[in-house]
Amino acid sequence: MVAPISYLTLYNAHNGDSVKIPKPIRFHSLNGLKSFIHESFTDYIISDIENIFLLTSFGMKVKFNIINELNDIYVFDKRLFSGARDETIINAYVNQNEGGYKEMIKPTPSSLVKLEKTNIKQMTSSLKVNDGWSKALFQDCLGVVGQMKAYVKQINTIFKCLNIIFQFGSNFINGIEKSFNNYLNYIKLLNLKTLHRSWNGYYNNLRKFPSFQLKNGTGNIKISDHLNTSELEKSSSFVSKTLPLVINKFNEMSASINSVNDDKVNVDKLIESLRNESIENFKDYDTGSEDIIKDVSRLSQLISHDIDKLSTNVSISLDWVYRIHKDEISPKIFDKATGLYKILQNLYLFKNKIVDESLSIFGKIANLQMRMVNIKNDLRILTNADDNNDIANENEISIHVINNIKSAEDYLSLTIDLPLLFGFMLIEKRRQFEWHEFYSKGIVNNVSEQLSVIIDHEKIFRKLWLKKFGNFLSILNSKDENDALRTVLPSIDVTLVNGNAESNSTFGIINNIQVERDDISTYINALEEYSNAGTTSSPSSKKFSELMKKNFQDLIKCTNNMKRVTKMVSSLSSFTSPVANEIKNNDKLLANSKDENNDKQAEGGGHMSELGEVDYDINLVKGLKIRIRKLENLLHQQQYKDLSNWPVTRSNGANATSTSETDGKFSLILDSNQKTSTSSNSKIDPTNLLQRRQTLPLKLGHEKPTTSQQSNHLDVSTTIDKHLDNIRLKKENNELTNENLKLSNTNRTNEKLIEALNKQISNLKTVNDDQNKHHEEKLRKRDAENQQTITRLETELQAFKPQNNKEVVDLKDKLSLRDAEILDLRKDITRLHDVNEGFTEEVTKLNEKIATLQSDINDVNAMKKDLLSNMASKETDTINHRISLEEEIKKLHSKIEELTEDYENLMDLTQSKHNNLDIMVNYLNNMIIHLLSSIKCLVEQQFETFIEFCFILESMGLLLIKEHNNNKNLDEYKITRVKGLKSKRNDKIVPTSANGNVLDETPIVSTMGNMPTSKVVDDINKIIGWVDDIQSFKNISTKSSEDGDEKSCSANTAGSVSSSVIDDLPEEITNLSVEETNKFNRQSLELVKLFRDIFKSSNGSISKFEDFINTIRFKENICINQNQDDSGVSNKFFLGAITKRFKDVEGFAKKLTKENKSKAHELSQLIGKLNCKISMNSFEMDDLVLFLPTRIDRAEEIDENFQPWAAFNIGAPHYFLRVQKNEGNKTGITHSIKDKEWMVGRVTYIEEHTVTDANFNDKDANPFHLSTGVVWYVVDAKEEIF
């Protein structure tokens, strides 16, 4: 399986933006990563990579060697930590990723207004426009939710960055505070234990310490005399004067640190308050926004569903649907969209708020760090020694003053500790003396002797071997004299350097005194008496005697260890002596006979202890004769050395002369002839004593050695060889000593374990024997008592048997009980025997364990030998490898120098080429800038021409639209007729086709008052968005280029290009500085990028420029309505649409004229019919109404002169005919209807009245006695006669 790709995420701490970089990181250094952040991530807002500050998620600085192990890196701008508020920088960061917030339009209310029921067509059109409005608003809501999520993510990132920078500052502060606290605790401890006030009492007690005399001393010693009273007073005065100053200084620094911590807590509270505010305001934004989206979607679908029902179901009331959409659904959609937009607005404002607050947080953190830096500098002055000022002013607190206080306190503390210190000096001086004595006289001398004896043993063995097999070897080596075997071994000389013990130790007041162990014991007793007498007031002084005793025991242990080392060194030669084999054989015999008799002494050279351990002391006595002979030989050799002044010291490879030959004595191994010749030669020439003896090889080969061969065997070692050999030998000796110490410790541990086990075994045996003896003694006593009791009872039985048989029976019972007790005792004895056997088995197991430990010791010794041999070989390999590496380094250095020279020459050759290419590139840059500016002017002019065409079309009621062609399955541009476009161009309208179908349900809303209504203008405006890139590029050009752009643009407008600016460009470019050249190099990259974006096609799609040209020509993807009259004009997109519009208007005008005539005739006929029909409800002017006489139900009195007439109606009561005077007027039909049963009249006037509590009883205001609140009408009518 392919491993998933991991990313490194960069977060901008000032706007919450982020970017991901795949791992592993392809940058070669941290500056490379910073350059990427400067160019791509921050868009050059940060201005310089030195202003970039990177932190990890743990508040630590980023290290490039671990960058691939990180997942998150947080980017900070150092300029925002200065404390000065730079609004331009923070605004640039905010505007970098604000998204589409400023482009989002605030939700607008529905365009539905109150319409009359009869206006069906307008209601239908308004409902369709409202459907498009709801869908558009739903899409806007989705965009708002997406932007809300982006803002929430950015806010969370900013909060995390605030926590990280706070953690970074806290770590910095805590580190300095921790260092300060260490010194503060030291000063506090110094102040707590100061003696500048109480030293007098301790000094007086010290003066009471008794004087004493050493065995080798010259007089009595009184330790209080070693302290100077004036010096004590001076130290006390100095401490009392300077210590308060030091304490005050540290208290001031502690107060500053506490103030910093308080400010740090305030910063933390500020961050926490911002976080709590965000939680309080936006904790439910997820669920709230989702609910709003669901509600808006549901309501929008409900609007679309109602409109679909209107087109399919005629029974649904249009007026009801219109009223529901206008009064209920549309306001809900608008309210929810407005609420969602308000949440987005609050998020945007809160993000800007925390960005603004972060500036103060950054400034406070930087201020805290600067204050801690000042504290750190003050602490450094107080704690670091100044080599240039050895004498510091007492009033100025420094490290010198603190050290002087410590020295003064140490001197004052001697008033308490001097008895203990003096005792330690006595013990240490004695320990060093004993160690030096054992080392110089015991170890060094014995090592020299033992090593020489070991060499002699090897010589003897080689000579014996040559005696047995040399005859055969001489036959094989007869032709090659150089291969003759010789009995030659290296010599050794161990000397003690710097061996004066008195000159190597300094003890001040007891330098010239020889200390004995009895002196130490006497001093300890005096110290105990001094402590027990109660003269001291210090609690710690009562423990002085215990400490002295413990130190004295350590001295004894150290001396005993040196004794053991000396004993071990003295036994080295016993392992290689001729009797060593006998010792080993005896060891085996003793080990085999150990089980038979552990107390017998083994026969042979050694003794075996109870644990089978060989005692080599007796064997060493047997080897003393050999060592004495060796010493005699060395003495004889030294005498000849003094006579001839010939060097005696040998190197490892030097050939030493056999000691058995130098003194003239005969060897027991060699022949008599050889001995005689050797003795005679040594008497003739003393220097021949130092030559290698080759008598045996000469005899075997029957040849005489030449003079050159003899000279080769001389010792030609130099002082340098001796020094190197001594160094190597010392190193090996140290290693062997360390290894020997380890093995000794292991052996000592095993011996202690064996001793403990032996003690345990002996204790168990003793306990077991004691128990056996005790039980046997107890058993004997019990048997004797029983026997006496039986005899006594038998006697009594015989005496009392005739008298009392009952007592006899009782006595028998008691006897049986005693027998049972005896049996129990015997069982206890048997059990103890079993326990004893168990202890015996345990002892056997312990013996086996001891044998195992002994074998482990042997294995460790063998391992030590292997390690020594491996170390020697590894050292040789290391030296050879180092020499080869040094040769390779020299070769590489020479190659580097050659490559450096070649590289410098190559750089000189290519520098001139680069300069010429830079000039040409800069010239081409300016040419491209002028061309791009000209293209920009042409595109803008073409776009303005297109806008003019759109205005012409809209002035004629035509609209350029883009709709989807289902047959061709592509979007086509089409010019269509839109009703009401001329009068309501800035209102929301619906484009329709010729057959009345809606072409685009999205409401057409003009965002600018001087722009056409067509949405195609916005599409083309988006297509030419790349023109703004040219404008932004021109802003970063040089002054000459910008002037040239303006001239070029104006010239292109006139149809020509300015050549004066272009001709001047090369001369200006050649005079550019390095900074300007770098600027043009960046411009070159930006121009290439801009050219690719505008003119290069990618992924099979056309370029942006070709897209604009193809679109603005309107030659492709267009729908043209063919005109039969003029095919040449109708093939043109805009001209054909305009011509068709004029012809449609003419045809439509003719059609309307004809229809108006027919409609006028039909209208006159309908009016005539309508005037002859009686109305029954909703009475209006000119309606024909039937009036009938009626009566008043609640009238108390009937007025015969007043007859009310009511209009015949359905659902419209209280319409009464005016038949009497009203405000001085009298109707014309008062007398004509007096005797009629009905009357038909045409309404001329209708007057409305309302019955209230005030006019209820008024006959004029309520002539018909109607109830309160009833609305009634008075109708003036003209009688119609048929």
Swiss-Prot record:
BP term (GO), one: autophagy of mitochondrion
**Which coarse location class applies to the principal site listed for this UniProt protein?**
membrane
Membrane protein topology class: Peripheral membrane protein
Q: What Pfam families does the record tag this protein with?
A: ATG11 (PF10377), ATG17_like (PF04108)
Q: Name one GO cellular component term.
A: Atg1/ULK1 kinase complex
Q: Name one GO molecular function term.
A: molecular adaptor activity
Query: For bias kind Basic and acidic residues, which ranges apply?
Result: 593-602
List localization entries. Preautophagosomal structure membrane; Vacuole membrane
Q: Region (Disordered): which ranges?
A: 586-609
Keywords recorded for this protein, A-Z: Autophagy, Coiled coil, Membrane, Protein transport, Transport, Vacuole
Report what the protein is called: Autophagy-related protein 11
* Native source species: Debaryomyces hansenii (strain ATCC 36239 / CBS 767 / BCRC 21394 / JCM 1990 / NBRC 0083 / IGC 2968)
The record lists the lineage as:
Eukaryota, Fungi, Dikarya, Ascomycota, Saccharomycotina
Gene designation: ATG11
